[in-house]
Design a protein with these regions (language model features):
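S-adenosyl-L-methionine-dependent methyltransferase catalytic module, highlighting the catalytic core
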Residues: 9-10, 35, 100-223
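Nucleotide-sugar-dependent
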Residues: 317-318, 387, 434-440, 447-470, ...
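Conserved acidic donor-binding segment of nucleotide-sugar-dependent glycosyltransferases
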Residues: 486-499, 507-512
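Conserved N-terminal segment of class I S-adenosyl-L-methionine
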Residues: 1-85, 89, 103-106, 137, ...
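N-terminal pre-catalytic "stem/leader" segment of glycosyltransferase-like enzymes
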Residues: 223-289
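Extended catalytic core of nucleotide-activated donor transferases of GT-like folds
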Residues: 261-345
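Conserved catalytic-core segment of nucleotide-activated headgroup transferases in glycan assembly
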Residues: 233-255, 362-363, 371-442
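A charged, aromatic-enriched C-terminal amphipathic alpha-helix characteristic of glycosyltransferases
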Residues: 363, 513-552
Length: 568
C-alpha cells in the first residue's frame, strides 16, 4: 500500500471508543505505526496489544508503541502469533478490503476470540454515492487511498457486511454508518429522483445506502444483553460533567450491548414498550415536592426507568434539599456519589447507594525532563476558594521572592489569587472548558491544592490531585481530602502549616529533579488505581443489578414517596 503522509499514524475514533474498556488482550490486523494501540493503552495500560503489519517501515515505528508487532501475510494460516489468551478484541481497521479472501481469513481468526470477545472492523461502503456517480459516468479512478484505493481487492455493502459476519458464525451487535458530507449524498439522490420509481427504489432507503463512507462493525460469539443508559447532566462546567457523566458512560458504551445518551437539556424517553433495560442517571437533580416535579418522576416510572441520582457535593450547602424532604435522594431508586463521607450523609435517605470515585479517562504522555535553568511552573485552578488559599498567599509570595527567576504561576478561574501573587511570571486564564483547563495544567510542573478543614470541603473528592498526577505534576496539598489519597513523600507532599509549605517549595526549587520524580510516581498511581476503564465492571454490574431488582426498588421508592402513586 502507498503511504501518504500520516496514513499509518491515524486513529479512527469510531474504532477507539468501541474497543471494550475492559479489554486485556487485543489483536489488531493492519496496525500501521501503532497509533490506535497507543491511544488505547493510555486508557487501559494493562492491555497486551499485538499488531500485524505488512508495511515494514510502519511496523518498525509500531514496535516502540505496542507489546508485539508481527510482519508477514495475515492470510497465511501458518502465521505464528505469540502465546496469548483468547482475544478480548480482534480489530480490522480498513483492512478486510485489501485481503484476497477476507471471508476465509475472518472465519479462521474469529475462532481466536474469547467467549465474550469482540470483532471490531471498519469497512468501506462501495454503495457510497461517489462510487455510484463514477460508475454512472463509466469511470473507476485509481487513487492512493480512500474508496478508490488501488490496493483494494474486495468491496462490501451494508448487506454483504451482514453476510460476512454471519458467515463467521458471529452475532452482529452494531453496524454503525460513518457519514461525511451528508448534503452531497442528498444532492446525488435528488438528481436520481425522477428515475427511482422506475428502478423500484425507495428514496430514503437509497439515501441510507449511499450516505455512509464506511461502516463500523461490532460482533461477538453470543448476543449481548442490552442496557440503555440515559443521562441528564448539568450544563457543561469544568470537569464536573466530563468526569462524573460523559467519560464513565463513554467507557461503559464500549461494552457490547450497552448504549448511552447524554443530554444537558431535554431527553426523549424510551417508550414503555418494548421494555429494554434502561436507567436514567440524573446529575444533581433539584427535586421539589411541587406537582410538576412529581409528574416528571411519575412519567419516568411509567416509562419503565430506574432512576439514579448522581451527586458529588455536600447537600447541606443547598437548604432547599432538606426543605423538600430530601426528595433529591428519596425520590429516586438509587444514588451514586464520589466519596464515602458523602455517602454517609446521603445513605440515611436512600440505602441503595454506590460510591464511584472520580477517575481520569486517559493518561497523558509522560513528561520530558526539566531543562536546566527552566522556571518551575505552579498551577492553581479553582472557583470560590479564597478562604482556602488566603492563609498561604504570604508563604507563596515569600518563596517566589527568594528566587523570582525560578518560578512562574498559571492560574485558572480565580482572578483574586492571580492578583494576590507578587511575581512577574504569572498568567491568568478565565473560566474555561475542561479541555482548556487540562491544557493549562499540562504546561505546569507543580499543583498547589489547598483545602481548609470544613464540612463542605471534607465532602469534596480528590479529583484535582488525580488530574495533576495524571499530567505528571508534583503535588503539594492540604491533608483535607488529599491526605486520604496521596502517599506523603511518595506521590505528593502534604502541608499543614506555613513552614511545611515553605520547605517543600524551597527543596523543589533547589532540586527540581525531585519535581519530575514525584510527578512520575503520581502518574503511576493513577495508572494503577484511578483510570475510568478500571471502574467499568463495577459500574456495569451495579447498573444491571438495579434493573434486575427494579420491582423491589420501585416498591421501596413508593414507600418513601407515596405521592408518586397518585395519578397525575
Amino acid at each position: 500500500m502507498s503511504d501518504p503522509s500520516g496514513y499509518h499514524d491515524r486513529v479512527n475514533p469510531d474504532l477507539l471508543w468501541r474497543i471494550p474498556a475492559t479489554a486485556r488482550t487485543v489483536l489488531e490486523v493492519g496496525c500501521g505505526s501503532g497509533a490506535l494501540g497507543q491511544a488505547f493503552k493510555a486508557r487501559q495500560p494493562a492491555v497486551t496489544w499485538v499488531g500485524i503489519e505488512a508495511e515494514s517501515s510502519a511496523a518498525a515505528r509500531a514496535i516502540g508503541r505496542l507489546d508485539h508487532v508481527l510482519g508477514g501475510d495475515v492470510e497465511d494460516p501458518a502465521l505464528a502469533l505469540p502465546r496469548l489468551p483468547p482475544l478480548d478484541c480482534l480489530i480490522y481497521g480498513d483492512v478486510l478490503e485489501h485481503l484476497r479472501d477476507p471471508w476465509a481469513c475472518l472465519q479462521r481468526q474469529a475462532t481466536w476470540l474469547a467467549d465474550d470477545g469482540l470483532l471490531l472492523a471498519c469497512i468501506p461502503n462501495v454503495q457510497h454515492w461517489s462510487v455510484l456517480q463514477q460508475l454512472l459516468q463509466g469511470r473507476w479512478p485509481r487513487q492512493d487511498e480512500g474508496l478508490f484505493d488501488r490496493t483494494h481487492l474486495r468491496w462490501f455493502t451494508r448487506q454483504s457486511i451482514i453476510e460476512l459476519v454471519a458467515g463467521c458464525g458471529l452475532v452482529l451487535h452494531e453496524l454503525q454508518p460513518r457519514i461525511f458530507r451528508p448534503e452531497q449524498a442528498a444532492a446525488f439522490v435528488q438528481q436520481l429522483e425522477p428515475a427511482l420509481a422506475g428502478l423500484g427504489l425507495d428514496r430514503q432507503e437509497l439515501l441510507d445506502g449511499v450516505s455512509p463512507l464506511q461502516y463500523v462493525v461490532r460482533a461477538g460469539r453470543r448476543p449481548a444483553p442490552p442496557l440503555q443508559l440515559d443521562a441528564l447532566s448539568l450544563r457543561p462546567q469544568v470537569g464536573m460533567v466530563d468526569v462524573r457523566i460523559s467519560q464513565p458512560l463513554r467507557a461503559l458504551a464500549s461494552r457490547p450491548g450497552v448504549n448511552a445518551r447524554v443530554s444537558a437539556g431535554s431527553l426523549a424517553l424510551l417508550p414503555a414498550e418494548p421494555l429494554t433495560p434502561r436507567l436514567l442517571i440524573w446529575q444533581r437533580p433539584a427535586l421539589t415536592m411541587d406537582p410538576e416535579t412529581l409528574q416528571r418522576l411519575r412519567l419516568l416510572l411509567r416509562n419503565g426507568y430506574v432512576m439514579v441520582c448522581e451527586y458529588d457535593d455536600d447537600p447541606a450547602h443547598w437548604p432547599a434539599i432538606a426543605a423538600n424532604g430530601h426528595l433529591t435522594f428519596r425520590g429516586v431508586h438509587a444514588v451514586q456519589v464520589s466519596t464515602e463521607p458523602l455517602a454517609e450523609v446521603i445513605r440515611p435517605h436512600n440505602a441503595e447507594l454506590a460510591v464511584f470515585g472520580n477517575t481520569i479517562e486517559s493518561l497523558p504522555p509522560p513528561r520530558p525532563p526539566l531543562l536546566p535553568g527552566e522556571p518551575l511552573r505552579l498551577f492553581f485552578g479553582a472557583l470560590n476558594r479564597e478562604a482556602d488559599w488566603a492563609p498561604w498567599i504570604d508563604t507563596l509570595n515569600a518563596a517566589f521572592a527568594a528566587a523570582p527567576d525560578r518560578w512562574a504561576v498559571e492560574v485558572v478561574h480565580d482572578r483574586g489569587f492571580h492578583d494576590a501573587l507578587v511575581l512577574p511570571r504569572r498568567t491568568f486564564t478565565p473560566t474555561c472548558d475542561y479541555a482548556t483547563y487540562r491544557q493549562v495544567m499540562a504546561r505546569c510542573d507543580i499543583a498547589f491544592l489547598p483545602l481548609g478543614d470544613t464540612r463542605f470541603n471534607r465532602m469534596k473528592s480528590d479529583l484535582k490531585a488525580i488530574e495533576a498526577a495524571a499530567h505528571g505534576l508534583a503535588i503539594v496539598a492540604s491533608p483535607t481530602v488529599y491526605g486520604d489519597s496521596l502517599q506523603e513523600g511518595v506521590t505528593g507532599r502534604l502541608f499543614s502549616n506555613a513552614d511545611q509549605l515553605r520547605q517543600v517549595l524551597e527543596k523543589w526549587r533547589q532540586a527540581p529533579e525531585q519535581v519530575r520524580a514525584y510527578g512520575a510516581r503520581g502518574r503511576a498511581w493513577v495508572a494503577r488505581e484511578r483510570l475510568t476503564a478500571q471502574q467499568v465492571p463495577q459500574r456495569e454490574a451495579w447498573y444491571r443489578s438495579l434493573w434486575e431488582r427494579r420491582d423491589e426498588l420501585t416498591r421501596q421508592l413508593l414507600q418513601r414517596v407515596p405521592q408518586l402513586q397518585n395519578p397525575a
